[in-house]
Amino acid sequence: MPKGKNSSGVVLAVCTAIVCAAVLYSLRYSYLSCSDSVSEFVYGRIYDFGFAFRRTLDFSLQRGRFGLIFPFVVAVRYQLLGSGSPFAFWALQYIPICVNVVLLSFILGRRAGVKCGLLLSLLFASLLQVNGWHSLITCYPLDFMYGLALALTGLCLFIKSTESKKNGLLLKIVSAFLFYESMQTYEAFLTVAAVYLVLSISVLKREGKLSFKNLVISLDAHMITGILFIAMRVFVMFHPIVPLQDGVEDLTRMGNPKDFVITLGAFSGGMFPLADLVHPRVRSRILADGFEIRDIVVSLVAGIGMFMFMKTCRKDEKAAAKVKVIGLCGIVGALCFPLIHSLTSVYQKWVVEGHQFGYVPTTISYFGWIVFITCAVSYLPLSGRTKGKAAPYVAGIVLFTASLLTCGINHALIVEKIGPTSITYSYRTQLFLAAAKDSYCSKEGYDLVYAPDFEGVHDSMMFHEIMLENESETPYDVFLISSPDEYYSTAPSYKNPGVILYDEDSDTAIITDSDEINEGHTVTLSDIRIISAHGGSFSVSYEDNGTTISHEITLKPGEGVTIANEAPVDTASIDVVAR
């Protein structure tokens, strides 16, 4: 290989690595981002492996999923969450995502060249919007990324089965098994059948054997698998094996055609590059706040990577033909994966009435869109359609601009708190966990704790209460309340109430006694505890009889500092500012 081409490949690889690392760094505190993640963390802390396995098995049987491997995977996840390690939380969140990005890059790289594979990773990271609509980027990805890895591996083995004369049948059977196992994780993986159809048609057409009969023979194992999965699900709906819970029948109630189109568009396109620019609040926030220097630098690196790809990728008709098929698979997967959910009335209501701009399938669709975009971009130089000198510069500028706008979008989504599973939810959960581990509440003997800034799990404080009781050095009983009206009516009947407040600007918790209630405000005559989940230097101020009292403190991650106080202080006046 000429030295120039080799060095350009290195530059592309370095650019890809830098952008991916920057994205992962920006998400370093993004875990425990939704109600389900928090509840399963709590379950993992108080229950054993067997409980997790049985709970997941029941969950699966309610939905007609018959398998033991998936419950085992979930039980392992419970145990890792139950370790209480922040690194375990983060690793469970992002290693599965990285595995699938690498797997897709490897597949494309093997078929169309290493640079095409690197480009996929670069585009995935550069254009990733971390929205708050149950995105798998921030919520419980292991189950679904495990399912996606099974589905992708099954597709690869299916192609291998068409190329292998010796082991073709065995590879096809294993592929069908992986197809089945992927559906154990999520019903929506049934739609991967559409991708199998595209691949089968492509192979038969290339071999000059395309006919309905040959198509059926090619897909027989997968057709049987899909029909069997549907039959088991229908059987269980009419003859439950275990008691059905709320939500099990949601996928059986059909909606209407108009709302189906709207829902499919939202669920499929919710993470399409720059899609969140449709939100007026996002656009306004970008215009108001602009872009940070690090975002400009990372976007510039992404643009350089794209420039190097377009400049050095040479014409290759065989590779061009392959990326056409892979790109078609990507767009079919992106459009079809949310199909089942989009047909149902409950999810149509979420979108049409609740204005939800995405759901769990949306992240899988994003993988499909990135495959399609990568293949579309790669096809231009591979097919010899970019002969001009301007093409690399134009492509680099386009990705730089799109990447920079994506950074602005992610900043706006955090600040504006769009969606129920935003990174802000992560920060609050991690902070509450830090407050529980700090043990200040148990040491002070609070029998009632008022936490108005923490929304709990599905509007219930039960799991946060369990967290507060069990994560302290000495477990104890406490009643946790988030409703102001409930607290003000209940507090007088308790001997030692306390409060946990959240300072949004500094991402810190304020814990103190609730000694008095004055005109709807809690007043403390006691010491004030400041806790940070991520550490830093802070200025703490509050009003004492018209005088502003200030303190400068420095905290390590998960650490707290107590500020001595005996004067009556309105807890609403306590302000913490990050320095």
Question: Where are the regions that the model predicts?
Answer:
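Perimembrane helix-loop-helix junctions
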Residues: 191-227, 231, 235
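Membrane-interface alpha helices of multi-pass inner-membrane proteins
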Residues: 169-187, 192-193
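Transmembrane alpha-helices and membrane-interface helical segments
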Residues: 102-106, 153-160, 196-201, 226, ...
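Intrinsically disordered, polar/acidic, low-complexity terminal segments
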Residues: 3-117, 211, 219, 236-324, ...
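Membrane-interface micro-motifs in multi-pass membrane enzymes
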Residues: 67, 116-160, 184-189, 334-376
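Juxtamembrane "helix-exit" motif on the non-cytosolic side of transmembrane helices
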Residues: 28, 77-81, 127-137, 205, ...
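Membrane-interface transmembrane helices that cradle and orient dolichyl/undecaprenyl
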Residues: 151-171, 206
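Transmembrane alpha-helical segments of multipass membrane enzymes and assembly factors
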Residues: 2-3, 103-120, 138-141, 159-164, ...
